[in-house]
Design a protein with these regions (language model features):
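Extracellular glycan-targeting catalytic surfaces
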Residues: 1-199, 206, 210
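Extracellular polysaccharide-recognition and catalytic grooves
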Residues: 181-250
Length: 250
């Protein structure tokens, strides 16, 4: 995990680098609208279906717009579509997008010039999921247990950004007790979900192991870290999948 000293060093590096300063401005611009108002946090879990998220006329994937939860545009014909299946397909990308916003806002709070508003919005996203996480049902899954999605590895990708945001806020001194409790709640349940579904020697299991490592660091759980890294299906075992040709094989 990042430390206070590392954050201070990065702030100095950003201040002294035109490229890093430009990158910081780009990230700030990308999140400007989120700072103005909180995007909709879906009240539903994502659903994988044959027709959800696709144009019924030409089969093209509908455009993801985080600010349009109910109307979804086909990039080919321009028609707008609505309905439960389209909304739940949209929810997959929205959940992932919100976690990305949370961690980028936390980075702005830890490294930027205007930390207050970015930290507050990031914490608001974390707390909202803390309040709702157990309300997302662990059902209608395709590959393993999940509350927000239909596959465990997606939950793993999501929790990595979620915990990344929390860790940055904590080291920046911007993680209040209520937000910390929300993060604890989500991380504990995510560990149970992800930990019970081992996909063996699989590319998806690398995401699961990475997520369990992040959770282990958050809770300072050495046993969980050891399992995610050193078990028969841990990260080290997956690294052995690299062959002499540089490719990785399941």
């Amino acid at each position: 995990m990042v430390t206070v000293e590392q954050l201070a060093a990065r702030r100095e590096a950003i201040a002294g680098s035109p490229d890093l300063t430009a990158l910081a401005r780009h990230i700030a611009a990308r999140n400007a609208r989120v700072l103005e108002r909180l995007p909709l946090v879906p009240e539903v879990k994502a659903l994988l279906s044959v027709d959800g998220g696709r144009c019924p006329d030409d089969g093209r994937a509908l455009v993801f717009d985080p600010w349009s939860p109910d109307e979804h545009t086909c990039p080919a014909c321009g028609r707008r579509h609505a309905g439960v299946r389209h909304h739940r397909a949209w929810a997959k990308f929205q959940h992932l997008w919100l976690a990305e916003r949370a961690v980028e806002l936390a980075a702005l709070a830890a490294l930027g010039n205007d930390p207050g508003s970015a930290a507050a919005r990031s914490a608001e996203i974390l707390c909202t999921y803390g309040d709702r996480y157990f309300g997302y049902p662990n059902r209608d899954n395709v590959l393993g247990p999940s509350r927000l999605f239909f596959s465990t590895y997606l939950e793993s990708i999501w929790i990595l950004n979620y915990l990344g945001a929390a860790a940055l806020l904590r080291e920046a001194g911007a993680l209040d007790d209520a937000t910390a409790r929300a993060v604890h709640t989500v991380a504990d349940e995510a560990a149970n979900l992800i930990g019970e579904y081992d996909e063996g020697f699989s590319n998806r299991q690398t995401w699961n192991n990475a997520a369990l490592c992040a959770i282990a660091v958050w809770f300072e759980d050495e046993d969980l870290a050891r399992r995610a890294i050193q078990s028969e299906t841990g990260l080290v075992a997956h690294l052995r999948g690299y062959r002499d040709d540089g490719l990785w094989y399941e």
